[in-house]
């Protein structure tokens, strides 16, 4: 029985999976838009959205929790100075997962993951 077994293994050990989602979350917070496989994108929501919720309340304890989960001081700084205030009035749903076709090499379903209210660069050049 699989009662209370949540999460997807994605063919990786637990330490590899933890490191992979830590890196994906760091990339997402740095660039605000990343492209990855669809199963990874769906599972990334479970990692990234609680971090943004944590960043809405800027305390030392919350910063330490965020650092423990991301291991990146620059990411923690951006979470608490930019992203936390940006989503102060939004109750969840900070990420958008958009399907992006299939990868050429192995036909894996791909997806874009983006932050919902990100600033889009619309340069006329």
From Swiss-Prot:
Q: Name one GO cellular component term.
A: cytosolic large ribosomal subunit
Q: Does the keyword Nucleotidyltransferase apply?
A: no
- Alphabetical UniProt keywords: Ribonucleoprotein, Ribosomal protein
Entries under InterPro entries matching the protein:
Ribosomal_bL17, Ribosomal_bL17_CS, Ribosomal_bL17_sf
A molecular function (GO) held by this record is:
structural constituent of ribosome
Top-rank taxon: Bacteria
Example GO BP: translation
Check the record and name the SUPFAM superfamilies matching this protein.
Prokaryotic ribosomal protein L17 (SSF64263)
- Asked if the keyword NADP belongs to this entry, the reply reads no
NCBIfam families annotated for this entry? L17
Indicate the quaternary assembly: Part of the 50S ribosomal subunit. Contacts protein L32.
Q: What family, per the record?
A: Belongs to the bacterial ribosomal protein bL17 family.
Q: What is this protein called?
A: Large ribosomal subunit protein bL17
Q: Which organism is it from?
A: Acinetobacter baumannii (strain AB0057)
Encoding gene (name): rplQ
